[in-house]
UniProtKB/Swiss-Prot annotation:
This is Serine hydroxymethyltransferase. The lineage of its organism: Bacteria, Pseudomonadati, Pseudomonadota, Betaproteobacteria, Nitrosomonadales. Catalyzes the reversible interconversion of serine and glycine with tetrahydrofolate (THF) serving as the one-carbon carrier. This reaction serves as the major source of one-carbon groups required for the biosynthesis of purines, thymidylate, methionine, and other important biomolecules. Also exhibits THF-independent aldolase activity toward beta-hydroxyamino acids, producing glycine and aldehydes, via a retro-aldol mechanism. Pfam families: SHMT. CDD domains: SHMT. Its cofactor is pyridoxal 5'-phosphate. Pathway: One-carbon metabolism; tetrahydrofolate interconversion; Amino-acid biosynthesis; glycine biosynthesis; glycine from L-serine: step 1/1. One of its GO terms (biological process) is glycine biosynthetic process from serine. The modification N6-(pyridoxal phosphate)lysine is found at K230. Homodimer. Keywords: Amino-acid biosynthesis, Cytoplasm, One-carbon metabolism, Pyridoxal phosphate, Transferase.
Amino acid sequence: MLSSYNTLETVDPDLWQAIKGEMQRQEEYIELIASENYASPAVMQAQGSVLTNKYAEGYPGKRYYGGCEYVDVVEQLAIDRVRALFDAEYVNVQPHSGSQANAAVYLTALKPGDTLLGMSLAHGGHLTHGASVNLSGKIFNAVSYGLRSDTEELDYDEVARLAHEHKPKLIVAGASAYSLVIDWKRFRKIADDIGAYLFVDMAHYAGLVAAGYYPNPVGIADFVTSTTHKTLRGPRGGIIMARAEHEKALNSAIFPQTQGGPLMHVIAAKAVAFKEAASQEFKDYQEQVIDNARVMAKVLQERGLRIVSGRTDCHMFLVDLRPKYITGKQAAESLEVAHITVNKNAIPNDPQKPFVTSGIRIGSPAITTRGFAEFESEQLAHLIADVLEAPTDSSVLTEVARQAKALCAKFPVYQG
């Protein structure tokens, strides 16, 4: 018999110490990685529930195992909530990650050797949009589009030119490091002109879309995927939305082609996050996310730093560090010493290697969850600029760390 007294602390003290260390790090460091956020206690409670014990291969009402009456309710709640949030015809909440959701779309729309057109990783795209090191770039003939050199905005003319030249069967829109609004309808027209499918990966923008602060690609694209963490603030996982005609093929692409049993405890946590995302509080939160990002970008520009594309319309932006003669790697390391976490990130036409880079990516979702507003975001941006102006000055790093920890103490992630 399992005893409820056998807690993690007593069963595995080594692991417990690592988790406690991570808890302390999250409380004492300012998190600016654009793809990270803090899940609510309710989301984490669902993910840590007895649902982790249940196998449920198949879909609601059509399982290969018995005893699925309650997990059917859980999964259907998640499906219905996504459908309502994004006005989707078809929804699959089983993908274990955004990458697996994307793979399912490729399996549905393409055959090995078919051509896809996606945003270049070097210009802000994602690995799964046809990068040569990823499965999407190995199995399929991947062609890449990028940004205009003069404005650093998406080059829709190039997308159209490449589409007509290469005749891809699938066009991929979406990005992991692009700060401006993407014109889904313009992509739709380009796809229609050559008879291609349009696939939108809105992983970074989904929370903003749910709140009405970023255009909704659902109903415009043939396929839409997203992660469920990032701006959606749920557990780590993926979802797929599509036109109803693709239901059978997409369901099969997830199970049995790429996955076995769904993670029912994660699907439950997703369902909680989707309910939270339908609230007015969440809408207000997403508005503040954008306000905070814009304030930080403006202050950094005033401090002499260059923002890629010149501005942000969403939760994130890239900082070009070349004028400061430091690399993204150096900047991220110095900021971490100062209790501020960012990720090094390539900028368009970056001369540095991918593990070094000439930029950093800054995102506002996590700090906004903590309660930061414009005042704190302005203060934080000045702290970042202080570090970037003197990345090797220990006295500066120590002082910034002191102020960062004070901000964290004022705005704890998990109170009580």
